[in-house]
């Protein structure tokens, strides 16, 4: 049964319009309150840092940390007073654009379902290959139909700023439809299992009364909400809590079938009265309905991000920017010094203005002048600001994305192929730890989408070899950055081998005998599939080599024949010049032969 169908089944088993919960709602509400307090206690240690990060980098993120339940009001309020230099803010969005285009680029396939644990020298079962290709196509199509790419471009900056980012993976109304929802920082709490994997997510949901009416049973809504809905106040916002956790099959989850993997409970934290003790809805999922990205694993529940790493530099940058603006203002409208005798007299500082002064001019100096000079200080502060901005950009990998662009365009004409490969490899490998964390997040996304499509029948039945356990499947990431990293590692080894062999060859010519040039070319074609179009087939190469071998053998034979003819002529001449009796040696030989 599909997720939507299962949810409708769960809701239909009640009497009338109210869901007849089988569990003890009072006990469940007590459990939820304790769970909420426990999760909040863990996260409150991180909140001061997150609040500071958002103010210095991107105040539009983490609005939920302000505690304002009216999200429309908080979204319309500016709180970017601490940002005088927008470079850190731009770094965040450049990073987001770089990761989106390099990892989850909608314009090209960035993942594929592949057979697992099959030897590279052997080919997978043709039926399994066909099924994997179909699964890949369906997954990428579902992601494109959904709002995944709009959500993912915000996942990257959230995780980079705060260290952690979370999304929901929800089934749509129609089979095969999927909806993704980004949860803003401050609106969710998480917990991990013993393996360090996030398995519990609690979130605070701000929704309009119209949305609440669509989401929950009418009779389960508080009476005050129902009255407001009847009055047409559909845009009034309310706040509910939602806990998504593994279904342990206990009494508190009595309303959920034990075969379901995850339980989801909506409840009112501060109200609810006698109506089911504030429990609004109990539902379930057959898959993990959320994915969490932790930028850097710090050993804690929540990750560490680039925002924390670059926060000291960002603070210093804003402070220096304030100094610079003040100095520029002093340069434009400088503090002045004048003799006390001019106190109370007007000074005309406009262009062409005249100020009358009755005192004596000393040493040719003007009676009114600047109190101090600021130009030299402006230059020094400006240089320091650029230096700090460059450091922040490096932390946010902006120089890496710029370098990758330059390596592939203008600078390519100024560098050798080896230099380009080495430079590209050096830069891309810096993203290795980041990609490891990204893969964990993306695997959760692909797994959720895959399970939904399987249950909805969008992906056909798995082949027998997969059902029997003789083979398995896995996700392979083929994005630009993933491919570049794999290529960089392989090409570095190939280039090192060729370089070392070339160095040894002059002293030890036999070293070249160890090199299999055909295998090197084939490996490079696997690393860069586009290059295969310019490489001849093995059969054609064999014909060319055979023809070349015949030509070389013929040339050697002709040379040997020429040498023999040359030697024969020289010998004949020598014999003819050797006198024997009345003749010469050549005549004697020819006569003897006769």
Briefly describe each language-model feature range.
Residues 1-234:
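Extended, helix-rich architectural segments
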Residues 125-131, 199, 295-299, 353-355, ...:
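A broad, low-specificity signal for short, low-complexity segments enriched in glycine/proline
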Residues 1-41, 57-58, 64, 336-594:
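C-terminal anchoring/interaction modules
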Residues 153-162, 227-238, 250-260, 311, ...:
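Short, surface-exposed loop and linker segments with low hydrophobicity and enrichment for Pro/Ser/Thr
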Residues 2, 6-26, 30-34, 171-351:
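Structured, contiguous alpha/beta core segments that scaffold functional sites
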Residues 55, 59, 93-104, 164, ...:
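Short, hydrophobic/amphipathic alpha-helical patches that form generic packing surfaces
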Residues 57-85, 156, 229-260, 356-374:
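An N-terminal domain-start capping segment
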Residues 124-171, 302-338, 373-406, 419-453:
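Long, contiguous amphipathic alpha-helices that act as assembly "spine/axial" helices in icosahedral shell
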């Amino acid at each position: 049964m599909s997720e939507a169908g299962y949810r409708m089944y769960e809701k239909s088993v009640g009497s009338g319009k109210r869901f007849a919960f089988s569990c003890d709602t009072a006990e469940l509400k007590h459990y939820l309150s304790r769970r909420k307090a426990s999760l909040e206690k863990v996260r409150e240690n991180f909140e001061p840092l997150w609040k500071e990060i958002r103010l210095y980098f991107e105040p539009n993120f983490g609005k939920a940390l302000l505690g304002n339940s009216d999200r429309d009001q908080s979204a319309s309020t500016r709180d970017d007073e601490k940002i005088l230099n927008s470079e850190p803010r731009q770094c965040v969005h450049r990073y987001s654009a770089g990761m989106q285009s390099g990892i989850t680029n909608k314009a090209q396939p960035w993942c594929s379902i592949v057979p697992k644990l099959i030897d590279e020298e052997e080919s997978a079962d043709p039926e399994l290959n066909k099924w994997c290709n179909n699964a890949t196509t369906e997954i990428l199509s579902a992601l494109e139909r959904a709002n995944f790419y709009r959500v993912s471009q915000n996942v990257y900056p959230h995780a980079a700023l705060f260290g952690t980012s979370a999304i929901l993976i929800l089934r749509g109304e129609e089979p095969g439809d999927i909806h993704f929802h980004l949860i803003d920082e401050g609106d969710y709490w998480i917990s991990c299992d013993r393996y360090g994997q996030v398995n519990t997510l609690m979130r605070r949901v701000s929704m309009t009364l119209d949305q609440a009416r669509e989401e929950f049973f009418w009779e389960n809504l508080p009476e005050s909400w129902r009255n407001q809905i009847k009055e047409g106040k559909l845009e009034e916002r309310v706040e509910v809590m939602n806990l998504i956790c593994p279904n342990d099959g206990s009494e508190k989850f009595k309303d959920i079938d034990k075969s379901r993997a995850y339980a989801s409970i909506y409840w009112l934290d501060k109200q609810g009265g006698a109506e089911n003790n504030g429990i609004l809805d109990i539902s379930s999922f057959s898959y993990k309905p959320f994915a969490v990205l932790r930028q850097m694993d710090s050993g804690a529940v929540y990750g560490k991000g680039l925002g924390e790493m670059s926060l000291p530099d960002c603070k210093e940058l804003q402070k220096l920017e304030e100094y610079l603006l003040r100095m520029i203002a002093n340069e434009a409208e400088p503090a002045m010094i004048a003799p006390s005798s001019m106190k109370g007299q007007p000074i005309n500082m406009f262009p062409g203005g005249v100020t009358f002064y009755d005192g004596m001019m000393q040493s040719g100096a003007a009676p009114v002048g600047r109190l101090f000079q600021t130009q030299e200080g402006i230059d020094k502060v400006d240089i320091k600001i650029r230096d700090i901005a460059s450091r922040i950009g490096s932390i946010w990998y902006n120089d890496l994305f710029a370098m990758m662009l330059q390596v592939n365009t203008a600078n390519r004409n100024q560098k050798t192929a080896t230099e380009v490969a080495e430079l590209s490899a050096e830069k891309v490998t810096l993203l290795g730890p980041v990609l490891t964390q990204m893969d964990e997040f993306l695997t959760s996304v692909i797994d959720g989408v895959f399970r939904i499509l399987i249950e909805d029948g969008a992906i056909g039945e798995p082949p027998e070899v997969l059902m029997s356990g003789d083979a398995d499947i896995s996700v392979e990431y083929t994005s630009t950055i993933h491919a570049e990293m794999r290529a960089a590692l392989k090409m570095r080894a190939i280039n090192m081998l060729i370089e070392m062999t070339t160095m040894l060859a002059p002293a030890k010519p036999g070293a070249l005998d160890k090199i299999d040039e055909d295998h090197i070319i084939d490996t490079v074609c696997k690393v860069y599939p586009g290059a295969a179009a310019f490489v001849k087939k093995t059969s054609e190469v064999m014909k060319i080599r055979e023809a070349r071998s015949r030509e070389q053998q013929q040339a050697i034979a002709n040379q040997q024949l020429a040498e023999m003819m040359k030697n024969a002529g020289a010998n004949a001449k020598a014999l003819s010049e050797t006198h024997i009796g009345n003749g010469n040696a050549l005549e004697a030989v020819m006569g003897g032969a006769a």
